[in-house]
């Protein structure tokens, strides 16, 4: 995915993106962002989906190891790709049920993957648009490397849909890098990688990586409250949120 010509064409427009705040996809291809580019280009859409599946593999183990899913009941993976992450969660927590939501073209291969993982009977696959709504009734909603793809307005729109679905006792888990407020001296390799990804999101989708304060602010805009941030052994953190009016013990 990273070495595909489409990436290099858009990254060549970095100066334009930094100067205007607009995506290279809009400048080069006349599409708002890379996601619409994926929909219009079947070849690159397949490359992107395969790349995101690999990315899910690299983060799923770290997420499962760092978070206690045992009391969630129903886990809804919003923008969950072809199901690698929800499969890993369900394998590690046999008592849970899952729902996988992503675009119909993305989840087309999910039933086979879930069957191979031995969890197909415990996971419903839903082809849909997270901007139109998300399935209700979950105890835990996960968005992994989803929110960083969007600007604040679109991120809040997705989070608001999750808030409507989550009820008063559910939780939301964002699997994302968390940038430091400031960097003094030489940044660590992880921070350097996160900052590079921040630029990548600007170029490709108009999204961005965010600090703890920025997560707190746009969660509040969606009637959610930042509960805690959990470190993992991988490159991402777990940003856990609850309904704004929930008690600390919810």
Predicted regions and their residues:
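Conserved Class I S-adenosyl-L-methionine-dependent methyltransferase catalytic core
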Residues: 1-74
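Alpha-helical subdomain
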Residues: 65, 69-250
């Amino acid at each position: 995915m990273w070495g595909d010509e489409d990436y290099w064409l858009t990254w060549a427009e970095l100066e334009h993106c930094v100067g205007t705040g607009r995506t290279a996809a809009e400048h080069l291809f006349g599409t708002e962002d890379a996601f619409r580019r994926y929909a219009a280009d079947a070849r690159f859409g397949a490359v992107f989906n395969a790349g995101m599946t690999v990315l899910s593999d690299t983060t799923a183990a770290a997420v499962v190891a760092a978070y206690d899913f045992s009391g969630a009941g129903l886990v809804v993976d919003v923008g969950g790709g072809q199901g690698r992450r929800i499969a890993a969660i369900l394998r590690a927590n046999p008592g849970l049920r899952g729902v996988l939501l992503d675009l119909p073209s993305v989840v087309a291969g999910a039933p086979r993957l879930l069957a191979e993982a031995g969890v197909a009977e415990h996971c419903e696959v839903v082809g849909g648009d997270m901007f139109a709504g998300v399935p209700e009734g979950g105890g835990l909603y996960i968005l992994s490397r989803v929110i960083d793809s969007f600007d604040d307005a679109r991120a809040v729109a997705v989070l608001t849909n999750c808030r409507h679905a989550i009820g008063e006792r559910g939780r939301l888990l964002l699997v994302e890098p968390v940038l430091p407020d400031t960097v003094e001296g030489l940044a660590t390799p992880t921070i350097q990688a996160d900052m590079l990804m921040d630029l990548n999101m600007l170029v490709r989708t108009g999204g961005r990586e965010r600090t703890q304060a920025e997560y707190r602010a746009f969660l509040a805009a969606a009637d959610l409250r930042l509960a805690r941030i959990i470190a993992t052994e991988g490159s991402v953190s777990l940003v856990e949120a609850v309904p704004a009016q929930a008690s600390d013990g919810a």
